[in-house]
């Protein structure tokens, strides 16, 4: 794990080229989307055979498959999922918004109506790991919001099955249906619908670059949560932080994939050296060490800042997905952080606490988008409608002002819609 001054790190960032706009990936994704639009389920069968090496006659997980899968899940794991689900539901319930109205003056009523989306789709990745936690984190906010139909798509394994733990989590979270479809083809199916899979109002959930680019291309035809990149962790630590804890937390994110980013910011060069040694000591002990080594080699850095102010400015510029504050004054520093997906405060608020258990969703903005984006929550699964009600007298009072504004924009039909009421009432 490389130790760099802030200046050196910034120079490295300037020389990095973005890989998100991969023209070949976009060409492949657009072809897949087009084929799913044209051929529906037949295209899904073709791509599932091509990419997942399994020939499926049907995509929906049946109730019997669901029940049998859940029976395979260890009771201790089921209890853990239930406990985490309870924490998530409790946290997300605090975000619920209600309808409201005001009467600023007699004859005028203004308000807002909050309604859940009708149907949402959640993409759950397969591949290098199973993600039942993502099922809970993405589906429970939708359920709390009042969404009636919650659909999951996830790539099947070589036996044409979905991981039983994912299905157990889906049942606990209140998911309506699960389909064995992955990749860009799943995003296309959720957007445009097929003979089997209905179209949805919004797609949420992480995926590989094909899923991510597909979500970007269908945005506008449906809503999406965000354009997610590789996982990120940034830890601001000083000599008060236990070095083994900091190292373990950095490596916990590095095991996601080779592109994951693990940064530690500190003002203490001696601490940085100890951390570097501890990271090197821990890596060989970990099960996914090959992925971790590749990730740390490419994207693992310890950045030396001159003082706390410089460190805070760097963090806010970076806007990391996960930020851990492991300094002697973590609570005092927290209000100074303006841009981060989630902030973990203190030595015992390890990032995996947020991944699995605490309650806030672990679906967070990446690639600096925490500067303008928020974590996934209940508010992502509702829409708001403005309510406007004027009495005859109040419209008459406002008529001349409205007509003046409409005519100033050259929209005489707008003006006429008001004038006709004014003249009719005065007749």
Swiss-Prot record:
Cofactor detail note? Binds 1 zinc ion per subunit.
Q: Which residues bind substrate?
A: 231, 253, 256, 322, 355, 409, 414
The Enzyme Commission number assigned here is: 1.1.1.23
Listed GO biological process terms: L-histidine biosynthetic process
Enzyme class (EC, first level):
oxidoreductase
Keyword match NAD: yes
Q: What does the entry list as the binding residues for NAD(+)?
A: 123, 185, 208
Q: Which reaction does it catalyse?
A: L-histidinol + 2 NAD(+) + H2O = L-histidine + 2 NADH + 3 H(+)
Where along the chain is Zn(2+) bound?
253, 256, 355, 414
GO molecular function annotations of the record: histidinol dehydrogenase activity; NAD binding; zinc ion binding
Catalytic positions? 321-322
Q: Which Pfam families match?
A: Histidinol_dh
What are the names of the required cofactors? Zn(2+)
> Which UniProt keyword terms apply here?
Amino-acid biosynthesis, Histidine biosynthesis, Metal-binding, NAD, Oxidoreductase, Zinc
Q: In which pathway does it act?
A: Amino-acid biosynthesis; L-histidine biosynthesis; L-histidine from 5-phospho-alpha-D-ribose 1-diphosphate: step 9/9
Has the keyword Oxidoreductase been applied to this entry?
yes
Task: Report the GO terms under cellular component.
Answer: cytosol
Per the similarity annotation, which family is this?
Answer: Belongs to the histidinol dehydrogenase family.
Known role: Catalyzes the sequential NAD-dependent oxidations of L-histidinol to L-histidinaldehyde and then to L-histidine.
> Protein name, please?
Histidinol dehydrogenase
Q: Which organism is it from?
A: Oceanobacillus iheyensis (strain DSM 14371 / CIP 107618 / JCM 11309 / KCTC 3954 / HTE831)
